[in-house]
Amino acid sequence: MSIQSFSCVDTETLFTTGKSARFSNFKSVAERKLAQLDAAPSVGFMRAPPGNDLKEYDGAWHVRINDQWRLTFKWGDAGPYDVLIEDPH
């Protein structure tokens, strides 16, 4: 299922153009996680690899990008939406 919407302009720009100064330190990992999310047939697909550390908090799902950053999204009938890369700490 394709990503339905983004709640962060920088995350959307990285996904659509491959460019983002804000996420330059971990750009390739973030792009890989976004591509995986875009292709995911279900939220459970994001459990692999185990390093993704998929967790649900307050109605949103979180996938680990690195020690500081997470790919956060909600999952509906049409797939992932409100996708953003954030520092939850």
Residue ranges and their predicted role:
Residues S2, K19, S42, P50-D53, ...:
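Glycine-rich, flexible loop/turn motifs
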Residues S20, A39-A40, Y57-D58:
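Short secondary-structure boundary micro-motifs
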Residues N52-H89:
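Enriched for short, Lys/Arg-rich terminal
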